[in-house]
Amino acid sequence: MPKIKTNRGAAKRFKKTGTGKIKRSHAFTSHILTSKTRKRKRQLRSSAVVAAVDHKNIAKLIPYM
């Protein structure tokens, strides 16, 4: 049986942690930053964990990570 292809867009956006969770970055950080507060921009820099409801679908996109 052939290997499953990794979705290259997903591979650039997500990373797996040591415990198997999937990390993601926040949106709304690329432009129109003057209207956002310093606190909001600082919090958006940190990474987040993918919600449990989305985990299964994203894991299918990155099978070998």
Swiss-Prot record:
Signal peptide: none annotated. GO terms for molecular function: structural constituent of ribosome. Keywords: Ribonucleoprotein, Ribosomal protein. It holds the Pfam family Ribosomal_L35p. PROSITE patterns: RIBOSOMAL_L35. One of its GO terms (biological process) is translation. Gene3D superfamilies: 4.10.410.60. The keyword Ribosomal protein applies. Belongs to the bacterial ribosomal protein bL35 family. NCBIfam families: rpmI_bact. This is Large ribosomal subunit protein bL35. It comes from Geobacter sulfurreducens (strain ATCC 51573 / DSM 12127 / PCA).
